[in-house]
Curated annotation (Swiss-Prot):
This is 5-methyltetrahydropteroyltriglutamate--homocysteine methyltransferase. It comes from the Bacteria. Zn(2+) binds at H641, C643, E665, C726. InterPro entries: Cbl-indep_Met_Synth_N, Cobalamin-indep_Met_synthase, Met_Synth_C/arc, UROD/MetE-like_sf. Binds 1 zinc ion per subunit. It comes from Escherichia coli O6:H1 (strain CFT073 / ATCC 700928 / UPEC). One of its GO terms (biological process) is methionine biosynthetic process. L-methionine binds at I431, G432, S433, E484, D599. Its EC number is 2.1.1.14. Its cofactor is Zn(2+). Pathway: Amino-acid biosynthesis; L-methionine biosynthesis via de novo pathway; L-methionine from L-homocysteine (MetE route): step 1/1.
Length: 753
């Protein structure tokens, strides 16, 4: 029984973000479709070859996507919303881009499909839309073409296909409501056809992804698996693939299926290998997801070996990444600025392939010397002074309940804040950032590259802050912001100023479409060596008599949008960040900043996959926010900002944050979101976003007024604020001025009654 290895998928964007550049060039009309397709072919060939050279036996094919793999599946099944269809009914790459972006070089623009987080990762997928009576047929043959490509290059191929039940689970019904699971029998014939085509090509194994099997699914959905897989059996061997959590709770459903193998995530799941071996049919292959596909840490391969060695020789076994390597940067070897010690702790996608090769060889031979050598740096890290800061650990251990309580309840604080700020009814403000112009970006880049000295850089930033204050005063806003000209990214900026974080040069991962992010890495205990935002906030406040908000990114968001440590809990990291930012709140307050906003857009998206785990997460997530904020005096007003489409299920926790003011994204839902706050009887102040900053359209005064009147039917007017629904970083100044002028006018009209 020779053990093989495989990956569940590989990053698509290219080491130098070649895919992103090719997509954006094509969208802008600067290159042809043929040139774009050629870049895709070149990247696929390179990535297959790199994995093979790193020692991977079975190469994933079908993991590449022009925008998103769920969207690719929609096209494969012929699920194209009517508004995005070509007039002749054909499907091409522009159809795909119209669904993803709302527009493409050909065809009519139409509203893009909704985008949401892929399970609990920072990757986003395009939500499939389903209508009653929908028809499906094999339409977009990208998967088959790529299998042919890989076979022609002489590779051992394992096609990757998103499974039918997870696909339906991820979608949403449009128009007349019905149970989307009822479409299962309509999509299964397309899956049968695809599997038949793969069988014709001599494919032995197909990786069929059903990550929905790690969720607490309704019984009807669990019951659908058996008949669905009965219909799919017989043409090729199916590796039923799960990830992001364990499968033990749904193992009875899984073991009844007519598949030939099961992949389990042994990093994020708590499944016991011996128990899995005992319960799985003896003729099934077990694919052990031992290498973390969604982090950047080198694995302790001696531990991984120990985890699996007892079942070697007892059943067919493969070793694999826990999930697709899509969530990891590509190659550590191109990082030249990380010091040698820290660099020795990391493994990116290609290094993870090497880890899988080392693990396979050791399991086949019984010789573990190479594993011990590879694991030495990560074992040495446990005792590194770069990781452990006794002062931080001592401070964290000393936290009491008092540290997460404001001195007085909201009603008492609100009184003190009204007396201090004397704001009018319907107070107007913005969420924090103003347009990041080419001048601002060039200024920051020149400084970063060493082409500009610190004095000239600071003079330039001060000028942009001054301009933002002048613009806001001219517009008549009530509470101002400094505009964040000095910040590249709301998480990266804080990470750069906190001890315990490091940054990469090329550690890009795909967020959605052509958007890539370069998350900070938490390598050790987090602390704040010096004030971060105080100087610029103080400067901005010196330019005006109106209050200027201090702007912080909250601890849960910094955690969720970074690569976390693996040796301590997420709760520990969040609370360490909270303590560091608590000192920032105290320093802002001492500098005369009376309104401080702590953004937590990631609070909801950090929720665990299983609802039964939510309470524990929300408890420490809320506590981290409160530790951050509770140092503020009664007359200091704490704001928070959140952008989600769903509040109902976490309203208790949002109220428990005890922020004096919460601003939320509501414009696209036509204020429907406020229903949650009304039903819950939310006690504090609230700023429902009155226009969508993601669109360049300028809202009319009448439209904003109508939205605010609608809001006032749900929330008492004396507790309402007036603001856009998000930061204005990505907008241009002309539409920003016009939209804010209309927003201020609408508020003034309402004050006059």
């Amino acid at each position: 029984m020779t053990i093989l290895n495989h990956t569940l998928g590989f990053p698509r964007v290219g080491l130098r973000r070649e895919l992103k550049k090719a997509q954006e060039s094509y969208w802008a009309g600067n290159s042809t479709r043929e040139e774009l397709l050629a870049v895709g072919r070149e990247l696929r060939a390179r990535h297959w070859d790199q994995q093979k050279q790193a020692g991977i036996d079975l190469l994933p094919v079908g993991d590449f996507a022009w925008y998103d793999h769920v969207l690719t599946t929609s096209l494969l099944l012929g699920n194209v919303p009517p508004r995005h269809q070509n007039k002749d009914g054909s499907v091409d790459i522009d159809t795909l881009f119209r669904i993803g972006r709302g527009r493409a070089p050909t065809g009519e623009p139409a509203a893009a499909a909704e985008m949401t987080k892929w399970f609990n990762t920072n990757y986003h997928y395009m939500v499939p839309e389903f209508v009653k009576g929908q028809q499906f047929k094999l339409t977009w043959t990208q998967l088959l073409e790529e299998v042919d490509e890989a076979l022609a290059l002489g590779h051992k191929v394992k096609p990757v296909l998103l499974g039918p039940i997870t696909y339906l689970w991820l979608g949403k019904v449009k128009g007349e409501q019905f149970d989307r699971l009822s479409l299962l029998n309509d999509i299964l014939p397309v899956y049968q056809q695809v599997l038949a085509e793969l069988a014709k090509r001599g494919i032995e194994w197909v990786q069929i992804d059903e990550p929905a099997l790690v969720l607490e699914l309704p019984q009807a959905w669990l019951d659908a698996y058996k008949p669905a897989y009965d219909a799919l059996q017989g043409q090729v061997k199916l590796l039923l693939t799960t990830y992001f959590e364990g499968v033990t709770p749904n193992l009875d459903t899984i073991t009844a299926l007519p598949v030939q193998g099961l992949h389990v995530d042994l990093v994020h799941g708590k499944d016991d290998v011996a128990e899995l071996h005992k319960r799985l049919p003896s003729d099934w292959l077990l694919s052990a997801g031992l290498i973390n596909g969604r982090n950047v840490w080198r694995a302790d391969l001696t531990e991984k070996y120990a985890q699996i060695k007892d079942i070697v020789g007892k059943r067919d076994l493969w070793v694999a990444s826990s999930c697709s390597l899509l969530h990891s940067p590509i190659d550590l070897s191109v990082e030249t600025r990380l010091d040698a010690e820290v660099k020795s702790w990391f493994a990116f996608a290609l290094q993870k392939c090497h880890e899988l090769a080392l693990l396979r060889d050791a399991l086949n031979s019984g010789d573990t010397a190479a594993l011990a050598e590879w694991s030495a740096p990560i074992q040495a890290r446990r005792h590194s002074t770069r990781v452990h800061n006794p002062a931080v650990e001592k401070r964290l251990a000393a936290i009491t309940a008092q540290d997460s309580q404001r001195a007085n309840v909201y009603e008492v604080r609100a009184e003190a804040q009204r007396a201090r700020f004397k704001l009018p009814a319907w107070p107007t403000t913005t969420i924090g950032s103003f347009p990041q112009t080419t001048e601002i970006r060039t200024l920051r880049l020149d400084f970063k590259k060493g082409n500009l000295d610190a004095n000239n850089y600071r003079t330039g930033i001060a000028e942009h802050i001054k301009q933002a204050i002048v613009e806001q005063e001219r517009l008549g806003l009530d509470v101002l912001v400094h505009g964040e000209a000095e910040r590249n990214d709301m998480v990266e900026y804080f990470g750069e100023h906190l001890d315990g974080f490091v940054f990469t040069q090329n550690g890009w991962v795909q967020s959605y479409g052509s958007r890539c992010v370069k998350p900070p890495i938490v390598i050790g205990d987090v602390s704040r060596p010096a004030p971060i935002t105080v100087e610029w906030a103080k400067y901005a406040q010196s330019l005006t008599d109106k209050p200027v908000k201090g702007m912080l990114t909250g601890p849960v968001t910094i955690l969720c949008w970074s690569f976390p440590r693996e040796d301590v809990s997420r709760e520990t990291i969040a609370k360490q960040i909270a303590l560091a930012l608590r000192d920032e709140v105290a320093d802002l307050e001492a500098a005369g900043i009376g309104i401080i906003q702590i953004d937590e857009p990631a609070l909801r998206e950090g929720l665990p996959l299983r609802r039964s785990d939510w309470d524990a997460y929300l408890q420490w997530g809320v506590e981290a926010f409160r530790i951050n904020a509770a140092v503020a005096k009664d007359d200091t007003q704490i704001h928070t900002h959140m952008c989600y489409c769903e509040f109902n299920d976490i309203m208790d926790s949002i109220a428990a944050l005890d922020a004096d003011v919460i601003t939320i994204e509501t414009s696209r839902s036509d204020m429907e979101l406020l229903e949650s706050f009304e039903e819950f009887d939310y006690p504090n102040e609230i700023g429902p976003g009155v226009y969508d900053i993601h669109s360049p359209n300028v809202p009319s005064v009448e439209w904003i007024e109508a939205l605010l009147k609608k809001a006032a039917k749900r929330i008492p007017a004396e507790r309402l604020w007036v603001n856009p629904d998000c930061g204005l970083k990505t907008r241009g100044w002309p539409e920003t001025r016009a939209a804010l002028a209309n927003m201020v006018q609408a508020a003034q009209n309402l004050r006059r009654g």
